[in-house]
């Protein structure tokens, strides 16, 4: 069993999934993961499918050098965005895995929320490309490790209302006036 960077507060109401050494760009996957953090599971799955179909974009906030602007980024209150298809597919597969783990634990999939998602750099893979005049340059890839923890949302119980509405506290002057009126009417 692999280590996770953080543990869930309520282990009985949460499930985990992780993907080590995924051959997908670290920077794109990091930005996609930040976009789905704290989303309900069903919304996150819909969002990733929309990213694959280029209906919604992923906002690029940290690794945004040279990233073009797109109109879809306005809903995230930013200007730069892209549609990292491969990252979205990998994260969608990871969410499906976590959902299967939740189903195995007997959790309700409709109440699950992406509580924690983290993307770490994995060891770079080295290849080579041949250049002019007999030179060789490195041709590196940037894989990543991804871990996700889904937690069942707590039900918010509304405060019970009393049958009788609470009476306003009256000041001493108003109480005195009420007593005087009562005495006069008798």
UniProtKB/Swiss-Prot annotation:
GO terms for cellular component: cytosolic large ribosomal subunit
Biased composition, class Basic and acidic residues, residue ranges: 157-167, 177-186
GO molecular function terms noted in the UniProt entry: structural constituent of ribosome
Keyword Flavoprotein: no
Pfam families: Ribosomal_L22 (PF00237)
Protein keywords: Ribonucleoprotein, Ribosomal protein
Superkingdom per UniProt: Eukaryota
Any one of the GO BP annotations: cytoplasmic translation
Family, per entry: Belongs to the universal ribosomal protein uL22 family.
Record's protein name: Large ribosomal subunit protein uL22
Chain's gene name: RpL17
């Amino acid at each position: 069993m692999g280590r996770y960077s953080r543990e869930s507060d309520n282990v009985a109401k949460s499930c985990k999934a992780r993907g080590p050494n995924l051959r997908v760009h670290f920077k794109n996957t990091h930005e996609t993961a930040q976009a789905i953090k704290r989303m309900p599971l069903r919304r996150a799955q819909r969002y990733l499918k929309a990213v694959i179909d280029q209906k919604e974009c992923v906002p690029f906030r940290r690794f945004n050098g040279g990233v073009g602007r797109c109109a879809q980024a306005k809903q995230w209150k930013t200007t730069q965005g892209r549609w990292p298809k491969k990252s979205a597919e990998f994260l969608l597969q990871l969410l499906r895995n976590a959902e299967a783990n939740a189903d195995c634990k007997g959790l309700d999939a409709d109440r699950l929320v992406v509580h924690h998602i983290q993307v770490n750099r994995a060891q770079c893979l080295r290849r080579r490309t041949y250049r002019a005049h007999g030179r060789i340059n490195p041709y590196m890839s940037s894989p990543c490790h991804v871990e996700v923890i889904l937690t069942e949302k707590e039900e918010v119980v509304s405060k019970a209302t009393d049958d009788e509405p609470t009476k306003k506290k009256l000041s001493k002057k108003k109480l005195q006036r009420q007593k005087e009126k009562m005495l006069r009417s008798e």
